[in-house]
Amino acid sequence: IYSQISSLAFEETVATLKDRLSAIYRVAKQNSFTRPNGVKVAKFVNLDMEEYRDLEITYAAFIDTLNQEEFFDYSAGIVLQAYLPDSSAIQRKLTEWAKERVAKGGAPVKLRIVKGANMEMEKLESVLNNWPLAPYDNKLEVDANYKYMVRYGMEPENIKAVNLGIASHNLFELAYAAVLAWENAVTDYFCFEMLEGMADHVRRTLQENAGDLLLYAPVASKEEFINAIGYLIRRLDENTAPENFLRYSPDLQAGSAEWNFLKEGFLRSCSSIDNAQKVPNRVQDREKEQYDPAI
């Protein structure tokens, strides 16, 4: 919604995004959606998360927009990527803000938790600028942080203010979230989310057994079809990465070598939930730097 996002012009960028998000939210409020049970609700708008450099900007724009009185009763959504060590801290800030909002009679918001699908772009930026890699550099910590965020979000006092969207095609991650929701008696406050055309047999089974499932489908006009290329490349990467569940999903059998490989990875990440790094990889603070003429 804004092509000139700049971290250096933080306040100005957030103000512009706030104006544009407000316009979108107003239209969403004016156009209702009828659920299968006949209940009418305002159209739902989810604010996606892409590049690491936009993380704080996206969060600030989301909060500032919803803090306006006209959106006090509107439920919008935001996405956080578990492959960023920073995301769990953002989730906690979001949750505390949402709790205060709900306590005052405001509408809850929704958080979609994903693992992240822009690793190659983040690696490129890191190399080109000689910066530390923003995401984790290993899958174990990504998976552990994902569970850490899901576990925190599933706590009854948290999920009632910040409803959850559990976005995954991994059977182990889906089962982990489902068990937590059942144990905490919060199944009414979360739903599974998947992508159209990905692990369709898993999607069908989930719909038959879990009921509430949100399916994402990309849309691009013929004139703007080039915009779909980035989406396609990310999906190809997810379907071929050696450690990724989707690589093995089509013919996966319980008890097979592939199943045991994936199970062991899941169990290792469960053991590392509280050990995954929770502080940013990029810690440069220019306000504390000392000028060295020799450099």
Whereabouts are the PLM-identified features?
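Positively charged, amphipathic and often flexible ligand-engagement surfaces
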Residues: 1-294
